[in-house]
Swiss-Prot record:
InterPro entries referenced in this protein's UniProt entry, alphabetically: AAA_32, Lon_proteolytic, Lon_Prtase, P-loop_NTPase, Peptidase_S16_AS, Ribosomal_Su5_D2-typ_SF, Ribsml_uS5_D2-typ_fold_subgr
UniProt keyword terms in alphabetical order: Hydrolase, Protease, Serine protease
Segments passing through the bilayer: none
One Pfam family matching this protein: AAA_32
PANTHER family noted in UniProt: ATP DEPENDENT LON PROTEASE FAMILY MEMBER
Active-site residues, as the UniProt record annotates them: S455, K498
Molecular function terms from GO: ATP binding; ATP-dependent peptidase activity; serine-type endopeptidase activity
EC number of the protein: 3.4.21.-
Keyword Protease: yes
Name the UniProt record assigns to this protein: Putative Lon protease homolog
Length: 601
């Protein structure tokens, strides 16, 4: 049988495995753990997680003149009922009657109808209210402002109260999306809030009301819920919005950096679990925390969404058909979801393993490095990590670095920025008196869709150095990280997915005990890796190397210093800058010889 597999290059002799192991992360650092000691804890409600929001709401409701609060939330449908209940429970007023009673004396063929008001005395009066909190995430002008109706035969008139009347004396909760989709509502609502008076208007711009209808005073406060984009759009349309409106936000992510914050969050989880008739032990709570850290990419911040937490608890309980959940149960539903959503990911990995997409995980190659990327497919709820081969070829030229993706409009602006930073960093580090006498072309091999982001700038820098110094890079090490012009390595997103993507390819090909990834030191707090990765690191089969700057990255990849440090170098340990300088000098000598040869001939 013919073997069509590519020949794998020999393993690098320059990469010091023992030196690298000493710089790799310990397996205990790969998953975060809660530090609370007491469990179970006293259950707390959602608003215990939102001290800033509760204080803002309280100040708004007690303020004598403020009538509009813009509140940033994740999804209005998720928080409207919570907010309505919070206001009803914590700002309950003595039951009193607000509003008026409209008395209508119907007209006849000889007279117009006559309408007048009298103070409301009971809730049976047509425009009476009790000052309650009401919410309506969708409404039209008739539902919001009420309506004026005329019977088609008798011509009798009827006044129908709207939400602004029913919430008189209390709070009305609306969505920014409704106001943006029907922006004509906003002008009238603003007038009502600023004047605290309700005036009747005809619904038809070319028809007048058949009779005068007296206005009446309102005592109304409105809270508008919306995400940041919706509130920003509304603020653009209403330039002076925050001259008369207040602002607060329900935090999408809450801090769990301190022990007391972890206790508060744990108490909230217990409250939610009790509402679903679910029991949790401490290990289950800790696993839930680890899964939420994967989503937030920060072990000190986790998602505060009640809907998200409720879904996770219900999914785990439904999947296991149990009400007493353990850590194994949460891991089980997590793995089931990965499999359920994982068709495209598995096809992508299969292409790499079948060498339809060429990614090397052993040996060493000049001018090639494995970068780490995150793939997102529209219409799917998850993303996943994938190694991508970045290659660089240099030739004599004028110093231009050609970004093939950018030239073919397959890369975004942030990618272009990262590419230019990598070039500037290299020139700054080498301290060249003039531009390089080389040109280079950089390619993300077998990449056919649009790419963006600067998380490959560290990989781009290293592959440029490899090509210029004519030194090979180890293919069993993948790398991610963004850099600045001074060579510092900065944080990137999706680090868990990136690590697990490269690990999966290495694991399915067979772990050699040398494979690993280089990540920014600052991303350690993002780590919440799978048990498989944790086990492989613990057994010395896979390594994760955090770096702070390009010097550490180059030392790991090449086994050499990037710059001369007044050491006694041998041919095998000569610094990278000296190798590049020697190549530049060789180019200059070649040009001089060509020049004299031209005149002698």
């Amino acid at each position: 049988m013919v073997n069509f597999s590519r020949k794998r290059p020999a393993v690098s002799s320059l990469f010091s495995q023992q030196q690298a192991i000493e710089q790799s992360l310990n397996w205990q650092a790969l998953q975060p753990d809660l530090v609370i000691q007491d469990f179970p804890l006293e259950p707390v409600n959602f608003w215990a997680l939102q001290p800033n929001a509760t204080q803002g709401i309280d100040l708004f409701l007690r303020h004598p003149t403020r009538s509009l609060l813009m509140m940033k939330v994740g999804e209005p449908v998720e928080y409207a009922e919570l907010l309505q209940n919070f206001i009803s429970q914590n700002h309950h007023k003595v039951r009193s009657i607000f509003g008026v009673n409209y008395v209508i004396e119907q007209g006849d063929s000889f007279s117009f109808p006559h309408v007048y008001t009298e103070p409301a005395k009971s809730l049976d009066d047509n425009f009476a209210s009790q000052g309650e909190a009401l919410s309506a995430l969708y409404c039209d002008q008739f539902q919001l402002f009420g309506s004026f109706r005329i019977h088609p035969r008798s011509q009798d008139i009827q006044l129908v109260p709207g939400l602004v009347h029913k919430a008189n004396g209390g709070v009305l909760i609306l969505s920014a999306a409704t106001l943006l989709s029907q922006f004509d509502l906003w002008g009238r609502l603003k007038q009502i809030l600023q004047t605290q008076t309700f005036d009747w208007y005809s619904a038809h711009p070319f028809k007048n009301l058949p009779c005068d209808i007296p206005s009446y005073a309102l005592n109304l406060k409105v809270i508008v819920l919306g995400n940041r984009t919706e509130l920003a759009t509304l603020a653009e349309l209403e330039e002076n919005l925050y001259s008369f409106a207040d602002y607060a936000e329900i935090e999408s992510y809450i801090s769990v950096a301190e022990v007391e914050e972890q206790k508060t969050w744990a108490g909230y989880v217990q409250q939610m679990a009790q509402e679903q008739n679910i029991e949790l032990d401490f290990l289950a709570l800790n696993k839930l925390y680890q899964l939420l850290v994967r989503e937030s990419e920060n072990r000190f911040l986790i998602n505060a969404s009640p809907l998200k937490l409720k879904e996770i608890l219900q999914d785990a309980s439904t999947f296991t058909e149990k009400t007493a959940l353990s850590a194994v149960d949460f891991e089980g539903i997590f793995q089931q979801k990965l499999a359920q959503y994982g068709f495209l990911k598995e096809q992508t990995y299969a292409d790499i393993l079948n060498e339809q997409v060429y990614v090397e995980t052993q040996g060493e190659i000049v001018g090639q490095i494995n970068g780490l990327s995150v793939i997102e497919y529209p219409g799917t709820p998850v993303c996943f990590g994938e190694p991508s081969r970045i290659s660089c070829i240099v030739q004599f030229g004028d110093g231009e670095v050609i970004d093939v993706e950018r030239k073919n409009e397959l890369a975004g602006n942030i990618h272009g920025k990262g590419m230019m930073i990598a070039q500037a960093c290299l020139s700054n580090i080498l301290d060249l008196p003039s531009q390089l006498p080389f040109s280079a072309s950089l390619v993300f091999e077998q990449s056919y869709g649009e790419i963006d982001g600067d998380s490959a700038s560290l990989a781009i820098f290293c592959v440029l150095v490899s090509a210029l110094a004519d030194l090979p890079l180890p293919q069993h090490i993948a790398i991610t990280g963004s850099i600045d012009q001074f060579g510092l390595v900065h944080s990137v997103g999706g680090v868990n997915d990136k690590i697990e993507g490269f690990f999966t390819i290495c694991q399915r090909r067979g772990l050699t005990g040398k494979q690993g990834v280089i990540i920014p030191m600052t991303t350690i707090q993002q780590l919440s890796l799978s048990d498989d990765v944790k086990s492989a690191v613990k057994n010395g089969e896979f390594f994760i190397y955090p770096v702070e700057d390009i010097y550490q990255a180059c030392e790991l990849l090449f086994g050499r210093d990037l710059l001369d440090e007044n050491k006694d170098y041998t041919e095998k340990t000569e610094s990278l800058s000296r190798l590049i300088q020697r190549r530049i000098e060789g180019r200059a000598d070649s040009e001089r010889k060509s020049f004299w040869h031209f005149f002698r001939s």
